[in-house]
Amino acid sequence: MKFATKLSLGCIALLSCALGAAGLLLTGQSFSGSLASTRTALQAQQEKEKYALERIIFQATDSAQFENYILASAAQQYAEQTADAGSSMALWLDGAYTLYSGLPAALPRTALKQALTNGENAWQLTRAAGRWYLLLTQPLDLPGVRADMLCAYDVSAVFATRDAQLRAWLA
């Protein structure tokens, strides 16, 4: 081969690699932005859910004592009133005991415990049964009780969009 042909093929290969890398970078940035905006929206939603659950708990009792059955009943009542296919919740006591859980059974208990350990304003992605879940924890403001609201939001659509973009780019 002549030098000019080799140079042309080398430039084409280099340009192809550069365009491929740029496409993957743009797809990654798009995914990161989409996941961040979804997470922010879900954190705001969870904050509203926390206040609504606290209101139900305070309405369920006339005393400052919060019995476990009252907490569990209030959590179940709230979950039934606000049932949504893309989200579910659990109420944990002292970070160790589940008082109520409407979470998907496929979510591993170790992931749930880790989300509780991470605490407020932390988030965790977990994959279970072919779905991606964003786990968020909020402590409830109840006097004398350490109760946490753990929510699992199905964010599989964000990952499906990313996968479709990658397939389109690589096709």
Where does each model-flagged region fall?
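Helix-start (N-cap) segments at beta->loop->alpha junctions
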Residues: 140-145, 150-169
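Juxtamembrane segments flanking the first transmembrane helix
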Residues: 1-94
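Internal alpha-helical transmembrane segments of multipass membrane proteins
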Residues: 121, 170-171
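Membrane-proximal, non-catalytic sensory/regulatory domains of signal-transducing membrane proteins
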Residues: 103-148
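Exposed alpha-helical structural elements
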Residues: 65, 70-74, 107-114, 157
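Extracellular/periplasmic ligand-sensing ectodomains of membrane signal-transduction proteins
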Residues: 86-114
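Hydrophobic, aromatic-rich alpha-helical transmembrane segments
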Residues: 4, 8-12, 161-166, 170
